[in-house]
Regions:
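Local sequence-structure signature of Cys/Sec-based thiol-disulfide redox active-site neighborhoods
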Residues: 1, 159-182, 199-200
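Short, solvent-exposed loop/turn segments at secondary-structure junctions
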Residues: 35, 116-118, 124-125, 172, ...
């Protein structure tokens, strides 16, 4: 459901390498997409551990080896961890896809808890806060958020004509609606020229948008807007002529 899937994957890897250090994590810079052979080695290792306490430990180790293309590390891991056969792996993947569809979501690589979805480390603070409020934290409600959102702080230094901020707003994107004023304010606070490069909504470019994706985007935007104190509520879908008139 992406107009440029290869470009999206490349940007995702670059973003991971840039964002990870701010959360105390790591991701290899310049990582390539893992080839099918390496993925085919990792899946059997994890399949039999889905309900095993070792899943997290083995998953992290396998993930690091996968993204680093470290065949030797996978060889050593395979000596310690039993592998599932191809049929068992296929059944596990199909079962996972059915469960995801039943819970009305459109993508893998997600966390799900009690009807709420979390798509990456930058959303985990929502899950942490929810668990703390429920009393599910061993440290009680005073527990610090492990993956809290870093503050949006432009600093005190003013732009010396070397920097510019380019924004690609989509008039149908709730994320654009939520973040536009903050983006303008950020640019103004340090005297950075803001250049707007509008983009046509994906569905108006022929990219399919399943209902589950739309539901997630709207609920995620509402969750994010509440967190930053941005106004977000009832709306009309501007697809079609309203978007064209807005751009004009």
């Amino acid at each position: 459901f992406a107009p440029e899937p290869e470009m999206l994957a490349e940007n995702a890897r670059r973003d991971c390498a840039m964002v990870a250090p701010h959360y105390g994590l790591s991701f290899p810079k310049g990582a390539n997409r893992p080839n099918a052979e390496l993925v085919g080695r990792v899946e059997p290792l994890l399949t039999l551990l889905r309900s095993d306490s070792r899943f997290i430990e083995v998953g992290l180790e396998a993930g690091r080896a996968l993204w680093a293309g470290d065949v030797e590390a996978l060889d050593k891991l395979s000596e310690r961890v039993p592998s599932a056969d191809a049929a068992t792996v296929r059944e596990a993947l199909e079962a996972g896809s059915r469960t995801r569809a039943k819970r009305r979501h459109y993508s893998g690589a997600m966390f799900s808890y009690a009807g709420e979805w979390f798509w990456g480390v930058d959303r985990l603070h929502h899950l942490e806060r929810r668990l703390i409020e429920l009393g599910a934290s061993s440290a009680g409600k005073k527990k610090a958020i492990r993956f809290d959102r870093p503050p949006l702080d432009a600093g005190e230094n003013q732009n010396d004509a070397r920097l510019r901020l380019e924004m690609f707003p989509s008039l149908r994107s709730p994320y654009t609606a939520m973040i536009f004023d903050r983006t303008v304010g950020l640019a103004e606070s340090v005297n950075i020229p803001l250049e707007l490069s509008p983009v046509m909504p994906m569905v108006m470019r022929g990219v399919p948008a399943p209902g589950a994706k739309g539901i997630y985007i709207m609920t995620d935007t509402l969750r994010e807007a509440k967190h930053i104190g941005a106004p977000f509520g009832n709306m009309h879908d501007p697809i079609g002529r309203p978007v064209l008139r807005g751009f004009s």
